[in-house]
């Protein structure tokens, strides 16, 4: 109901599109948030949590699980203008900024630009073995379907998840703890920030910035994620678009923060300082 109210309040339908193309449907919102991340920082093995904190991504881990409102996101995409990178609303222009990225979902925005290589020193299979301790099997062909576990830097998410069962063994050596931490990091980055249209695969390319793991806090992940979001919003604003990726939870939380009359119930948890990101204030409905 709230999404419908927002659509009525914010959307002025393009009449040419309405009569020539028909009313566009809802966009498919690509987002992956695995069950083992739902417990946040407090629900994680403290050995893994320590490494994620050292990587500077503990704020993102604190963001609670929420279902995406496809209607809300579609309504906002309808008002997105690629030429200005902003939402054109009846009362003026608004956009999502780096401040929103840091304050709402706790992603660091200060540091070096996220610029690396797209081809590893040897092969992505070797890189996966080095960073995560597991080597994907060789390419297999089943009929006309490519069943390869790894394509470039992208690994089948289910295969990778099966390599890291919960819980972490009590007597796990530090090398295994670091591999688990890198797995959680790549799941957070690939599922919450840099989600693309290939929902069954996840890229390990980001792990080059976490060698060692503490090196990750030197980079502005918020800047990279915001650029990725702008790209997906621009692509999704095309009339032929059917789906959208990127940090869509930020888009939803941004709308809740900017239009409080449509947000669900807010909570004010009793927590020790420093407080977590703004996202923890919302109870998804």
Report the location of each language-model feature.
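Extended, charge-rich alpha-helical regions
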Residues: 146-166, 256, 261-285
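Hydrophobic, mid-to-C-terminal alpha-helical segments
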Residues: 200-253, 263-273
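N-terminal leader regions that mediate targeting or early regulatory function
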Residues: 1-230
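Short, charged low-complexity intrinsically disordered segments located at boundaries
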Residues: 130-136, 215-220, 241, 256-264, ...
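Short, intrinsically disordered/low-complexity patches at protein termini
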Residues: 127-128, 134, 253, 274-278
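Amphipathic alpha-helical segments in well-ordered regions
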Residues: 192, 254-257
